Amino acid sequence: LSRNIESSLPSIKSYRSYMGSYNGLYNLYDNKASIASSHLWDWETSEYNIDFVKKLLPGIPCTIINLTYRTQGFYVQKGNPKNINGWEDLKRDDLSYVNREIGCGVRVLLDGKLRELNISSNEINGYNYEENSHLAVASAVARGKGDFGIGIEKVAKQIDNIDFIPLQKERYDLVIKTNDLENPIYKQILNIINSDTFKDELEGLGGYDLKDTGKIIAET
């Protein structure tokens, strides 16, 4: 998306910051970001992003626009020697976990599942072992640094010696302050997201469901 923005709007320089969904929304609130991407799962409602946007950008009208859906699941070692099959395996004391950093969508998903299953984080071997990307988690599992970790399906196809256990389809959205949508620059960004060229490029990457790409999911 960033590359397409710069190609379509040569006078605009797009800066990307990989800081996690939670921090991205906070920076949007703090006027340090123009657009935030988010995949934050609310364990109480099983909904993505909407409640977090309301809480982290209080009183600020925002528009939530879908970018894609993707599958989250467990990375496990090739052949799944520990027979890991689902969320209930988080209760097992014979497994070691590779976690993600605080503030990212994967960490919020894990912590929500622990609440849902009434599991204390202290019961998770490796809860404090953090990596900072899907790729790093998958690589750690492949190297035997842990038995499993959460990440997206697409990355599992890039790393040897791991298998992928699909668990949950997540909605990955863009969050824009509603008042900004009157700006021609933001209108052009929405045109890019809705264009066949952008969708074809995203589909070509594999692992993404584009059924709602460009659709307004909610207005807060």
Which residues fall in each region the model found?
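N-terminal segment of the mature folded domain
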Residues: 3-80
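Short beta-strand-to-loop elements that line the ligand-binding cleft
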Residues: 13-20, 100, 121-133
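Hydrophobic residues within well-ordered alpha-helices
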Residues: 28-29, 90, 110, 138-142
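A ligand-binding cleft/hinge motif common to bilobed small-molecule-binding domains
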Residues: 37-53, 138-168
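Periplasmic-binding protein-like
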Residues: 58-71, 159-191, 193-216
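Short helix-loop capping/hinge motifs at secondary-structure junctions, enriched
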Residues: 78-85, 179-185
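Short loop->beta-strand "edge-of-pocket" segments that line small-molecule binding or catalytic clefts
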Residues: 88-108
